[in-house]
Amino acid sequence: MKNVKEKQFEELVKQYKRTIYSVCYMFSRDKEEINDLFQEILVRLWLGFDQFEQRSSVNTWVYRIALNTAINSDKRAKRRPQTVPLSTDIDPYDPQDSSLEQVRQLYALINQLDVMDRGLVLLWLEGIGYDEIAAIMGITVANVGIKLHRIKEKLVQKSKSVTH
């Protein structure tokens, strides 16, 4: 029989599963890596579940743990030697559909950003407000706006260099 804590945690996971997968997908396209990262985030959430003091919203807490875990995982992966996968994933986008191709190109450009900028863009794309982004990322609200503006400029420049 499950205790109260386990039931509460299951509800939290049900409610924030999409959010966690969004973070995972922003940091990897490999299905196995995404699942590994998802599991690692769940472990971190479980370990921190008792310590959550509700000084911020649950949404902010989940995003912060998910992003920090993804960023740390990304840093560890960069220190590992590169390997060549045995199989390649099939691109789910139809190359005939130009709007999907544009989205794919945008995500490819976003993935070229450093991990902190990627995290910031992810939160913004998820529709999170500047106040909550600031709380999650540990920066000021003004800095969120400045960073997003600079990231957008960077993405525009990168997209121009790709199309020319």
Question: Where do the model's predicted regions map?
Answer:
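Structural recognition of an alpha-helix C-terminal capping motif at a helix-to-coil junction
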Residues: 22, 36-43, 56-68
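A short, charge-rich alpha-helical start-of-domain segment used by transcription regulators
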Residues: 1-22, 35
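Short amphipathic alpha helix immediately N-terminal
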Residues: 112-132, 136
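Hydrophobic positions on the alpha-helical face of helix-turn-helix-like DNA-binding modules
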Residues: 41, 65, 120-121, 133-134, ...
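Arg/Lys-rich amphipathic alpha helix in sigma70-family domain 2
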Residues: 51-53, 64-84, 99
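DNA-recognition helix of helix-turn-helix
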Residues: 71, 137-162
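Internal acidic/polar
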Residues: 79-106, 129-130
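Sigma70-family region 2
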Residues: 2, 40-57, 76-77
